[in-house]
């Protein structure tokens, strides 16, 4: 009995590949092999067989990739122009990367003796160049307006960076100077494609670049904001903004967005506290001063609005939008004065700012100074003065 069990054990230990695995290894094309892997995976004897099956997919797809890459290399050497099947090359690169990660997953599992004895560690180096090819493949698809294909390749490249398959790749080899640029483009495409979770992943990487930080943050905020259909949606977005702002309190985009949300939700206490804290940290914070001026405009407090908007203009004296709001506040202040001489002085001051706004943007492309300027001229000169008539005409052009 014991002898029979020993024979049975030996037979099991040294058994060859299962029929399910043999079927995969007989396949001549990647498509056939992949279909058989998907069909027979559950019938394979163990995790080692599954790893071997996926490694075979790596071999087939890398051959497809390498065959086309060899043509490119020979063209460079011989100065020929033999045709290259870029579609086959790119698909080979993609399939090799996906299969290598699946192979790694099963290759790292304990065997029947409870030991981890990986056989395919070389796949990381083997598919690394194929992985890099997906950057160009995605960009080519993007320029051809094939968003789905671009994201297929870029997502595979981007998401695989953190794969344990590549843990042993040296850091200097992993350094990719184009990473933030591709991440920014990937964020934009993912947002357009309604894959918001992936867009946020891309944004977080793109924001590490000084060149793309501002644009990537705008995309991230747009994604986080969503449609804001309910009160709860708005509160969730506010909390997201708070978290971001807590980690980057000098970021004026976050400050302005959080201020706008507080204003839209009529959270006056929180809004004023936000702006006061920003100014306590930096009294010359232009956004905080401008937003505080707008806060007081909403509260019909012209004096405080004027005070803050003037301070904002001291920091950015060419900001026409602030000039228009300041001019409007001065008009309100002037109209409320009983003293004719006092009104005259304030209207003159309003005209100074509104004339400057007109000078900076004569065609009113960025801000509309027209009505406020006409109102100031009307208040100072009356309805029939030629200057008032001209200001009225300017406002209508």
Positions of predicted regions on the chain:
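Short coil turns that delineate tetratricopeptide repeat
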Residues: 45-48, 108, 162, 211-212, ...
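Residue-level detector of the short coil/turn that links helix A to helix B
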Residues: 28, 145, 194, 228-232, ...
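Canonical tetratricopeptide repeat
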Residues: 56, 170-172, 178, 185-188, ...
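TPR alpha-solenoid repeat register
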Residues: 53, 166-170, 182, 215-216, ...
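Conserved structural position within tetratricopeptide repeats
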Residues: 42-45, 105, 159, 205-208, ...
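Short coil/linker segments at helix-helix boundaries
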Residues: 62-148, 152, 156, 160-181, ...
């Amino acid at each position: 009995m014991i002898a029979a069990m020993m024979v049975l054990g030996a037979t099991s230990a040294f058994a060859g590949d299962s029929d399910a695995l043999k079927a995969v290894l007989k396949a001549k094309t990647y498509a056939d092999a992949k279909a058989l892997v998907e069909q027979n995976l559950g019938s394979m004897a163990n995790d080692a067989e599954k790893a071997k099956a996926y490694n075979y997919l790596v071999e087939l797809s890398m051959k497809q990739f390498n065959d086309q890459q060899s043509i490119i290399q020979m063209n460079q050497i011989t100065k020929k122009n033999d045709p290259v099947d870029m579609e086959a090359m790119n698909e080979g690169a993609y399939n090799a990367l996906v299969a290598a990660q699946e192979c790694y997953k099963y290759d790292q599992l304990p065997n029947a003796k409870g030991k981890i004895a990986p056989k395919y560690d070389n796949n990381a180096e083997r598919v690394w160049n194929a992985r890099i090819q997906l950057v160009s493949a995605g960009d080519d698809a993007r320029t051809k307006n094939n968003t789905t294909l671009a994201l297929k390749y870029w997502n595979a490249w981007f998401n695989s960076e953190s794969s344990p398959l590549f843990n042993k790749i040296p850091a200097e080899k992993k350094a990719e100077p184009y990473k933030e640029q591709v991440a920014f483009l990937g964020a934009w495409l993912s947002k357009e494609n309604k894959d918001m979770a992936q867009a946020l992943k891309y944004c977080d990487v793109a924001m590490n670049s000084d060149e793309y930080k501002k644009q990537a943050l705008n995309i991230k905020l747009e994604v986080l904001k969503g449609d804001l259909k309910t009160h709860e949606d708005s509160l969730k977005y506010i909390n997201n903004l708070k978290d971001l702002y807590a980690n980057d309190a000098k970021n004026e985009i976050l400050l302005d967005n959080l201020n706008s949300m507080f204003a839209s939700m009529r959270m006056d206490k929180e809004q004023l506290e936000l702006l006061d804290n920003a100014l306590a940290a930096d009294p010359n914070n232009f956004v905080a001063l401008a937003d505080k001026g707008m806060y007081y405009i909403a509260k019909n407090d012209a004096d405080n609005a004027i005070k803050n908007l003037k301070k904002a203009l001291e920091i950015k004296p060419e900001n026409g939008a602030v000039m228009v709001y300041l001019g409007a506040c001065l008009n309100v202040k002037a109209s409320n004065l009983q003293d004719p001489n006092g009104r005259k002085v304030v209207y003159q001051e309003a005209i100074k700012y509104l004339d400057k706004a007109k000078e900076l943007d004569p065609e009113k492309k960025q801000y509309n100074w027209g009505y406020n300027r006409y109102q100031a001229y009307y208040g100072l000169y009356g309805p029939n003065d030629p200057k008032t008539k001209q200001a009225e005409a300017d406002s209508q052009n």
